[in-house]
């Protein structure tokens, strides 16, 4: 990141922050506020924190970072705050998480559900069209 700033490179560093450093909450293992985006200032670049569950927020923030890079504004660190549903590795019992955390996250923050609700309520696409897309994707998965 240092050289990207020194050389004013047109790049975007994307951090997918799921709140855990393997099996330790990042609150216990990361200095500063726990936000990776805050670290960008030390390298002289903008750091942007965005809700990684929100497609449109990520799209907008990434678009601004791309525009900045294309216009000679140098690098950006884009931190997408989100949650993971599965463990850090195959067989991870996730004993470090509250038992109902994943269930609650799936019910309240699922990015696909949020996307579907937003585009259908805004009239951008009909729910039946999304259902058709879902069926086609599931068929492709089944066939592969």
Q: Residue spans of the language-model regions?
A:
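Glycine-rich ThDP/TPP pyrophosphate-binding loop and its adjacent helix/strand module
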Residues: 1-143
């Amino acid at each position: 990141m240092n050289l990207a700033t020194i050389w004013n490179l047109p790049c975007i560093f994307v951090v997918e922050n799921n709140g855990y450093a393997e099996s330790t909450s990042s609150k216990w293992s990361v200095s500063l506020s726990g936000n990776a985006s805050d670290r960008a200032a030390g390298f002289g670049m903008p750091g942007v924190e965005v809700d990684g569950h929100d497609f449109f927020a990520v799209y907008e923030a990434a678009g601004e970072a791309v525009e900045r890079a294309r216009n000679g504004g140098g690098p950006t660190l884009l931190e997408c705050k989100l949650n993971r549903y599965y463990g850090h590795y195959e067989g991870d019992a996730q004993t470090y998480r509250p038992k109902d955390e994943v269930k609650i996250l799936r019910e309240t923050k699922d990015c696909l559900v949020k996307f579907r609700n937003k585009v259908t309520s805004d009239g951008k696409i009909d729910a039946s069209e999304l259902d058709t897309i879902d069926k086609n994707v599931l068929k492709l998965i089944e066939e592969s």
